[in-house]
Regions:
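HotDog/MaoC-like acyl-thioester-processing domains
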Residues: 1-15, 95, 99-104, 108-165
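Hot-dog-fold acyl-thioester-processing enzymes
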Residues: 2-89, 154-165
């Protein structure tokens, strides 16, 4: 899937205080181990027994794995059908509870601020808070950061000369 060449969601479609809930991904032991082998090979992400001996009490997903899952859920929910231009970064990220095999994750996004980019007025900035919730509605991760979105194009004149006197 790629970003839409004619997106339906632009900067103007984000409203201050708006809350969106999206995603439902059930984490498997196999994907926890696969991600950990590639990107975060700490024992408690690779082996159930090592996980049980850790403060997590079982095989736990890497926090970076959880972040990658959030990114995918954001893409599926709205980014791929938007005028997204990327992100200048996150202001904070906190891992609050371990994500274990069998957990089903979803995301609650709250729009905290919207404003045009001062140096590039055709781009709008959106600051959001994301809370990642498991199937028990426990918050396992919080993030806050900015997204950049293209602004909605001005409507084209219907015919040459329209609006002239």
């Amino acid at each position: 899937m790629t970003i839409s060449s004619s997106p339906t969601h632009h900067w103007e479609d984000f409203s201050l205080g708006e809350v969106r809930e999206f995603g439902a991904h059930t984490v498997t032991a196999e994907e926890i181990v696969r991600f950990a082998r590639e990107f975060d090979p700490q024992p408690f992400h690779l082996d159930e027994e090592a996980g049980r001996a850790s403060l997590f009490g079982g095989l736990a997903a890497s926090g970076w794995h959880t972040c990658a899952l959030v990114m995918r859920m954001m893409c599926d929910a709205y980014l791929l059908d938007s005028s997204s231009l990327g992100s200048p970064g996150l202001e904070h990220i906190k891992w609050l509870k371990p994500v274990m095999a069998g957990d089903t994750l979803g995301v609650r996004m709250t729009v905290l601020e919207t404003r045009p980019m001062a140096s590039k007025p055709h781009i709008g900035l959106v600051r959001c808070a994301w809370a990642v919730l498991n199937q028990r509605r426990e918050t396992v991760l919080t993030m806050e950061g900015w997204g950049m979105f293209g602004r909605r194009p001005a409507p084209a004149l219907a015919a040459a000369g329209e609006g002239q006197s």
